[in-house]
A protein has these predicted regions:
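Structural beta-strand segments of beta-rich domains
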Residues: 14-18
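Short amphipathic, basic-aromatic surface patches that mediate peripheral association
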Residues: 21-28
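Solvent-exposed, conformationally flexible loop/turn segments
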Residues: 11-13, 120
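Ser/Thr/Pro-rich, low-complexity mucin-like regions
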Residues: 79-106
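Beta-strand/loop edge motif enriched in small/polar residues
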Residues: 110-476
């Protein structure tokens, strides 16, 4: 700028200014010299030439300015740099002789008409002011409900945080103490991404709802985050226990770490029709207690996840009158799922490429009711297709289970009461195993199952297990 300070963005209506220091280009100590640099934008990729003039005799400091032209198309003959709002700008200069006598190409970049944000934010993020560039943590204060409009692009400076705050002092995060709704549409999504030259997973932290998680996220794409969304630490008091359902729908999470983390939250959740691809967990939910005055619903429907797994632990209402219900339905997962310490579970019409693990280590935390129906389970490694432990009442029906290299068990029931019917179980080491101990008597029904091509056993009953087995088709 005119004060010789580097700028991250040029305001609309301003001019580009370049400063170059190179004492080698001071070829005449008694005269003013000139050098040439090249300018490009994302709109005009063919370089415009800008002649820089030395600031005085024998200074080796060169300056030049160039005007912008806001246009959706480039023109190489107008002596203007054609730009659109949010364009990245680049200046390049070839130093004929660096400190080692070599020719070196040097580049610097800035942006045109980007809205910079850092610190407290109490206004909506609009498409008219997009794109936004967050240079430090942005905090939405309590009692404010903000919106991010459809079509907004939110960029983050990589691996830096000028606020030095939040969970990660070296990465930018959006911290929500009030409410935040991301309101993308199918035709006009919201984008969150790194602003780095070579963007990578973990360049920025994520969105973190804390204290009072009021907000929904729809039709957004997340790139380069450490953790897409965290809902955490809702105070267990009357003012928070009536939170509306939190909805995460129709989002795409790629080139990032983990997807959705939910901890210490008392609110209904709906996670629908999202796409996740990454090395972390698509959903991790733990230490969430149900409301003491109402039922509590956690829905996961219509999602595609190409991640590591889904973990849901302690989604439970410790009350005789109300319960937590977890529904996993119509999803396509290239992994398995693990659930423990909840009240009621329904897992229906999903595709898994990993096992379903349900239950807990003790009967006190056992799941009350389980329905597993209509799923396709294709194992990609040697573990159980369905494993239940300390489940009080379970129905497992109409599932297709295919093992991996004749290893482990298709359906394993430990200290659980289950009705297992009309399943097809093949290519495991054991088709169905049942076990319990003297202190936890159970009774399991095995009806009309097809148990074929398993390596060792069709049905294996051990310890104090008891079964009623009728009309099953069992053969190698």
């Amino acid at each position: 700028n005119s004060s010789d300070a580097a700028v991250l963005t040029y305001a609309a209506g301003s001019s580009l200014r370049v400063k170059l220091i190179d004492s080698d280009r001071n070829q005449d100590a008694s005269a003013v010299d000139q050098v040439t640099v090249n300018l490009t934008s994302e709109t005009e990729t063919t370089a415009e030439s800008l002649v820089l003039t030395e600031s005085g005799d024998n200074t080796g400091i060169f300056y030049g300015t160039y005007s912008f032209n806001v246009s959706s198309t480039a023109s190489s003959s107008n002596s203007l740099l054609d730009v659109q709002k949010g364009d990245k700008l680049e200046v390049s200069y070839t130093d004929p002789s660096d400190d080692f006598g070599n020719s070196t190409l040097i580049k610097a970049s800035s942006y045109y008409d980007v809205t910079l944000l850092s610190g407290t934010l109490a206004t909506n993020m609009t498409k008219a002011n997009s794109p936004y560039l967050l240079t430090g943590d942005v905090t939405i204060p309590a009692n404010y409900d903000l919106e991010i409009e459809a079509g907004v692009e939110v960029r983050f400076t990589p691996l830096s945080d000028d606020q030095s705050s939040g969970n990660d002092k070296n990465r930018v995060e959006i911290i929500v103490n009030g409410g935040l709704d991301v309101l993308g549409t199918a035709s006009d999504t919201v984008r969150f991404l790194s602003n780095g030259e070579s963007p990578a997973s973990g360049d920025w932290y994520g969105i973190r709802y804390q204290s009072y998680p009021a907000g929904n996220v729809s039709y957004a794409r997340f790139d380069h985050a450490t953790q897409m969304i965290q809902y955490q630490n809702v105070s267990y008091n009357d003012s928070n226990q009536y939170s509306d359902t939190l909805k995460i729908r129709h989002n795409k999470i790629v080139n990032s770490g983990s997807g959705i983390s939910i901890s210490s939250v008392r609110a209904n959740m709906s996670i629908d029709s999202n796409y996740y691809e990454g090395s972390g967990s698509f959903i991790s939910a733990y230490s969430n207690r149900g409301r003491s005055d109402a039922n509590f619903l956690f829905n996961v429907r219509g999602n595609t996840s190409k991640g590591a797994s889904i973990y849901i632990n302690e989604y439970k209402n410790y009350s005789d009158n109300y319960e937590v219900k977890v529904v996993i339905e119509n999803n396509h997962f290239t992994h398995g799922i693990s659930l423990s310490s909840t009240d009621r579970v329904e897992i229906k019409n999903n595709h898994f490429e990993g096992g379903i693990s349900l239950g807990s280590w003790s009967s006190y935390d056992g799941i009350k009711h389980v329905l597993i129906s209509g799923n396709t389970i294709m194992m990609s490694r040697g573990s159980s297709g369905i494993y239940e432990s300390h489940v009080i009442n379970s129905e497992i029906k109409d599932n297709q289970l295919t093992g991996y290299n004749f290893r482990s068990t298709g359906i394993s029931l430990n200290q659980s009461n289950a009705k297992v019917s009309d399943n097809v179980i093949s290519k495991f080491g054991t088709g169905i195993s049942v076990s319990t101990d003297f202190n936890h008597p159970t009774f399991d029904s095995l009806l009309r199952n097809t148990i074929v091509y398993n390596g060792n056993n069709g049905v294996y009953v051990s310890d104090y297990g008891r079964v009623l087995a009728q009309y099953n088709n069992i053969y190698d």
